[in-house]
Regions:
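Alpha-helical metal-binding/catalytic segments enriched in His/Glu/Asp
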Residues: 55-59
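Heme-based O2/NO sensor domains and their adjacent alpha-helical segments
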Residues: 62
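Extended beta-strand/beta-hairpin segments
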Residues: 1-53, 65-145
Length: 145
């Protein structure tokens, strides 16, 4: 169980003469981070792409955890996200759309809405950190099996 007081630390190291970094947290696998041409070489994820992945996986983790605690059978889960950037600097996201695609034979829309609300309100720290500055719209679709 993750301790609430656990301190996380990361390291990013420059690997070329542009903006290509290798980053890691603790003993996890490194991730390649770069910037778009001409400043970078497109050799890895951009920082905003990593933010989208972090948000999607954070929401997905909390949603799946609560659905499983409700004894729901989940045969598949795919989360697609799209970020819409601001025109002015800093050109971070002004809006992010997250679509959760779930495969299940016993899941209801109400079940999913309930756990999404829990994720938004309390259990997804990435969402909690960005919600004040970025509109986040979460939708879902259930594929019946």
């Amino acid at each position: 169980m993750l301790e609430k007081t656990k301190e996380l630390s990361s390291t990013v190291k420059l690997v070329n003469n542009k903006l290509h970094f290798m980053g890691s947290v603790d003993n996890n696998e490194p991730v390649s981070i770069d910037y778009i041409s001409p400043l970078g070489d497109d050799l890895g994820y951009t920082s905003l792409e990593l933010l989208l992945l972090s948000l999607s996986s954070c929401i997905g983790s909390s949603v799946l955890t609560f659905l499983r605690r409700m004894n729901k059978t989940i045969s598949s889960c795919e989360i697609k996200s799209r970020g819409f950037r601001k025109e002015e600097h800093p050109t971070g996201f002004r809006k992010i759309e997250v679509n959760i695609l779930l495969g299940s034979g016993d899941l209801t829309d109400e079940d999913v809405r309930k756990v999404i609300a829990l994720s938004e309100d309390k259990y997804c720290p990435v969402y909690s950190m960005i919600k004040a500055s970025t509109e986040v719209i979460i939708s879902h679709y259930i594929q019946r099996n």
